[in-house]
Every structure is written in C-alpha cells, then in structure tokens.
C-alpha cells in the first residue's frame, strides 16, 4: 500500500506533479524544479519531508545500543543536539545515513531515509533480541515515522524567517543543534540542518495522519496543516516557495551530497560489478569514530588494508550533455566506473554528477569522459560543492 504524509491532500491540490517515491506518494514539483531550486539558492523554500523515518530510543541502555549500531560518537553532543552517523551491516556496507538527536533523559531520536526505516526497524529489533538472549536490556524502540511531521525550510532567507516565526537566530545554533520552540501554541523541535547545502532549519512534531496504517491513529492533521500554511504565510515577504522532491534532489547534488540508494546502499551498484558501498568508498569516513566498537568496523579495517577498489568522485561536464544514473565513465578509452547521480545544474546550467570509479581516478582535476547516448563526452573531476561557496551555500560571504 502506498504511503502518504500528513498533509498529502494539500500537496495533491497544489503540486503539478505527484508520484511515488520510495513507497511514498509525494510532491515532485509545484511550479517547476528550476524555479523551486533557484528560490532555495537565492531566497527560501519549504519542503515537506514527513516521509523521512523517525525512531525514538528510550532507556538507560539506549546510548550504549546506539553507539554499537552506528559509526559516529553520539555520546559527546549535549542535549538537545544531533550527530550525523551511519548504520552499517556486518560487511561494512551502508544500511543508511542518519541523524541521531540526544533529547536528554536517556532518550534519543533517529532520523533516517524514507526507504530505509522499515528495514532498520527490523534490524534494530533483531539486534535487541540477540542481546536479550544473554541478559536484560533497558531499551524501548518506537517507530514514529507515520506520527511525526517534518518540514524543512532552506535558503539564505530561512534565517530571517526563523526570527519572525520563533524569535531565534539559527546562526546561534551549531549545525545539527536543536531547540524546543513553539508556534501558535504548537510545540516542536527545531534543528539547524538540511539537505540542500544552504543555511536552514527543520521542525519535528507529532500530529494525526489521515493515512496512518493503523486506522485507530488516523485523524485530521490540524497542527501540520496550520504550521505549513503559517510558514508559507510568514515567508511570503521573502518570496518563499513550496518545493518538491525534484528540487531537493538537484539541490543536494549541487552541494555534492550522497543519496541513499544511489551513492550508499547495501545492494549491487547499478549494472556494474561493484560490491556493496562502504563509507570509505563514499567519502563518509568523517562520520566514523574509530575509538569504539560498532557493527561493520572489522570489515572496514580489512578494506583499508586491501584497498577500496572503487571510490566516489564528483565531476562536471566540459562538453554539452546531461549525465544520468547508470552511464559509463571512461578514461583513455577504458571503462573506469559508472554514474550514480547526474543532472543539469539549474544554477550553473551545465551537467554535473557523482560516479564510482577506480580508486586512482577518484581525485579532482582529472579529465574523464561520460558515455551519453553512446557517445563519449568530456568531463572533469572536481571537489564539491559544484557552486562557488563564497556566493552560495550555508557559509556564503554576506
């Protein structure tokens, strides 16, 4: 059965394109991908990302459990703040990229990808049952995916909008730090975070979902609809646009961010013989805290010894052409890898992409080719982001 977010009916009425993504029926665009993309880069946009998965971990053993099932050190950040961390399988492959927020009182919230929450729920519960065979564990794992509404407000004007709505300056928060806020009597958690490369914030709160799989939990999403429309109303003076998943993807690609299912996954990578993707291959080793034990650590240490084989690299087109997922990447006439994400950059007007290539080619400044419609087109490897960070992005010069 297709899944739907709390205010799906609003999206159905206002979006020009709604289609299934990762099992969820979601807005792809309202006006156009380019218009929404540029609104975020130059002003402000709002995304409904309530399809993201959320778990609550409660109990005295919650921290120790999360330290074991994720790669980063989540013991350091104080309440209320988050940590970018990975969930790996025993072979070191990425099951998902997640955020874990320390809510205080032995309680943590994990935010994960929309197409990973079901397998993660099964994974976590299986690990918990395995631990219980050898003794008791003070841990409750609750899946809040269908209950939690999540809106993402992104762009250089997102800071001004947060001041107007909540009376706070998000620049006083470090990245992934959170704060409890209230809007018209509705309490929510606000974090300085996003997936666009821009400055921004995201809010989390529970509400009724008319499409909840449990009929007893269904109801009118009065809070979610009010918050969504209130943000749009207050943001009108900044030219706010509702933005769909189409713009969210082009924005994250311009920023050079990975996408679960494309750059990180457990399955085979597209049509090549590349094995499961590890964080070392996907340049995500910054999210690994080596001074602890975690699932997949031993496999990663072995991979470091034998070599990665293939690795992720960013590239931009020199010739005209739009790279797409699955296109071959060549060097000196030899196939060296494959594109995992590609698009025409709405900001730059050129083709950009991410590929997995032989390890020796995974560095910036190399000339490569991308086979587009049977013809090799020139490209060059680069360091992300694709845009000038002095002019665009969260740390642009004001």
Swiss-Prot record:
<protein>
    <recommendedName>
        <fullName>Probable aminomethyltransferase</fullName>
        <ecNumber>2.1.2.10</ecNumber>
    </recommendedName>
</protein>
<dbReference type="InterPro" id="IPR022903">
    <property type="entry name" value="GCS_T_bac"/>
</dbReference>
<comment type="function">
    <text>The glycine cleavage system catalyzes the degradation of glycine.</text>
</comment>
<dbReference type="InterPro" id="IPR013977">
    <property type="entry name" value="GCST_C"/>
</dbReference>
<dbReference type="InterPro" id="IPR006223">
    <property type="entry name" value="GCS_T"/>
</dbReference>
<keyword id="KW-0808">Transferase</keyword>
<comment type="similarity">
    <text>Belongs to the GcvT family.</text>
</comment>
<dbReference type="GO" id="GO:0019464">
    <property type="term" value="P:glycine decarboxylation via glycine cleavage system"/>
</dbReference>
<dbReference type="Pfam" id="PF08669">
    <property type="entry name" value="GCV_T_C"/>
</dbReference>
<keyword id="KW-0032">Aminotransferase</keyword>
<dbReference type="InterPro" id="IPR029043">
    <property type="entry name" value="GcvT/YgfZ_C"/>
</dbReference>
<dbReference type="GO" id="GO:0004047">
    <property type="term" value="F:aminomethyltransferase activity"/>
</dbReference>
<dbReference type="InterPro" id="IPR028896">
    <property type="entry name" value="GcvT/YgfZ/DmdA"/>
</dbReference>
<dbReference type="GO" id="GO:0008483">
    <property type="term" value="F:transaminase activity"/>
</dbReference>
<dbReference type="GO" id="GO:0005960">
    <property type="term" value="C:glycine cleavage complex"/>
</dbReference>
<comment type="subunit">
    <text>The glycine cleavage system is composed of four proteins: P, T, L and H.</text>
</comment>
<dbReference type="InterPro" id="IPR006222">
    <property type="entry name" value="GCV_T_N"/>
</dbReference>
<dbReference type="InterPro" id="IPR027266">
    <property type="entry name" value="TrmE/GcvT_dom1"/>
</dbReference>
<dbReference type="Pfam" id="PF01571">
    <property type="entry name" value="GCV_T"/>
</dbReference>
């Amino acid at each position: 059965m297709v899944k739907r977010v709390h205010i799906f009916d609003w999206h159905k009425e206002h979006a020009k394109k709604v289609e299934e993504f990762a099992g969820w029926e979601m807005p792809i665009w309202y006006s156009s991908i380019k218009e929404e993309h540029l609104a975020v880069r130059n002003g402000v946009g709002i995304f409904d990302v309530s399809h993201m998965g959320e778990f609550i971990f409660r109990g005295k053993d919650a921290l120790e459990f999360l330290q074991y099932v994720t790669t980063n050190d989540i013991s350091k950040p104080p309440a209320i703040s988050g940590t970018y961390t990975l969930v790996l399988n025993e072979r070191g492959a990425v099951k998902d990229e997640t955020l874990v927020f320390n809510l205080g009182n032995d309680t943590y919230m994990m935010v994960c990808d929309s197409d990973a929450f079901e397998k993660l729920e099964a994974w976590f519960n299986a690990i918990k049952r395995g631990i219980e065979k050898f003794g008791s564990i003070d841990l409750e794992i609750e899946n809040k995916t269908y209950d939690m509404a999540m809106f993402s407000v992104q762009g250089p004007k997102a800071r001004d909008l947060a001041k107007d709505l909540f009376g706070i300056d998000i620049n006083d928060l470090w990245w992934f730090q959170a704060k409890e806020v209230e809007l018209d009597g509705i309490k929510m958690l606000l974090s300085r975070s996003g997936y666009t490369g821009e400055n921004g914030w995201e809010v989390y709160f529970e509400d009724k979902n008319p499409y909840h799989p449990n009929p007893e939990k269904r109801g009118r999403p009065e809070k979610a609809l009010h918050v969504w429309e209130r943000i749009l109303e207050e943001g009108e003076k900044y030219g706010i646009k509702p933005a769909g998943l189409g713009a969210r993807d082009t924005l994250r690609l311009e920023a050079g961010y990975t996408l679960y299912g494309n750059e990180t996954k457990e399955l085979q990578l597209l049509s090549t013989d590349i094995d499961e993707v590890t964080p070392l291959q996907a340049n995500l080793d910054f999210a690994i805290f080596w001074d602890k034990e975690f699932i997949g650590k031993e496999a990663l240490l072995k991979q470091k010894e034998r070599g990665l084989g293939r690795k992720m690299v960013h590239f931009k087109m020199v010739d005209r052409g739009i790279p797409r997922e699955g296109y071959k990447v060549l060097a000196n006439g030899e196939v060296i890898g494959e594109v995992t994400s590609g698009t025409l950059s709405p900001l730059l007007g050129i083709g950009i992409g991410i590929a997995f290539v032989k390890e020796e080619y995974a560095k910036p400044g190399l000339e490569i080719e991308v086979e587009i419609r049977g013809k090799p087109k020139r490209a060059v490897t680069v360091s992300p982001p694709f845009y000038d960070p002095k002019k665009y992005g969260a740390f642009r010069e004001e």
